[in-house]
Amino acid sequence: MADALKKGSLIRVNREAYLSSVEAKASAGDPPAYLLEGPGEVLAVKGDYAQLRFRQPVPDIWLRMDQLEAYAGS
């Protein structure tokens, strides 16, 4: 599914993939709810990574594409 993601795609972070990642191990505590609930927007893609922006007053972040899934909405 991450292969279909491109600039402008709405995403959410896959809980299992993120929690077992190096990025999660380097972060303090549990991930914030907005990260796992979405939606976030893909701003750029470089190699295996995507730059993400969430509708929160937080900095943009880079995560591996295999940790992302398309946002289905609600």
From Swiss-Prot:
Which InterPro entries does the entry link to? NdhO (IPR020905)
Reactions catalysed, semicolon-separated, are:
a plastoquinone + NADH + (n+1) H(+)(in) = a plastoquinol + NAD(+) + n H(+)(out); a plastoquinone + NADPH + (n+1) H(+)(in) = a plastoquinol + NADP(+) + n H(+)(out)
Keyword Acyltransferase set for record: no
Q: Cite the EC number.
A: 7.1.1.-
Q: For this UniProt entry, what is the primary localization, expressed as one broad class?
A: membrane
Q: Which UniProt keywords apply?
A: Membrane, NAD, NADP, Plastoquinone, Quinone, Thylakoid, Translocase, Transport
Q: Which domain of life is it from?
A: Bacteria
Q: Which residues form a coiled coil?
A: none
Look up and give the membrane topology term: Peripheral membrane protein
Q: What class of enzyme is it?
A: translocase
What compartments host this protein? Cellular thylakoid membrane
Task: Output one GO MF annotation.
Answer: oxidoreductase activity, acting on NAD(P)H, quinone or similar compound as acceptor
- Listed Pfam families: NdhO
**What cellular-component terms does GO give this entry?**
plasma membrane-derived thylakoid membrane
Assembly and binders: NDH-1 can be composed of about 15 different subunits; different subcomplexes with different compositions have been identified which probably have different functions.
Function, as annotated: NDH-1 shuttles electrons from an unknown electron donor, via FMN and iron-sulfur (Fe-S) centers, to quinones in the respiratory and/or the photosynthetic chain. The immediate electron acceptor for the enzyme in this species is believed to be plastoquinone. Couples the redox reaction to proton translocation, and thus conserves the redox energy in a proton gradient. Cyanobacterial NDH-1 also plays a role in inorganic carbon-concentration.
What family does this belong to?
Answer: Belongs to the complex I NdhO subunit family.
Write the protein's name: NAD(P)H-quinone oxidoreductase subunit O
What organism does this protein naturally occur in?
Answer: Synechococcus sp. (strain RCC307)
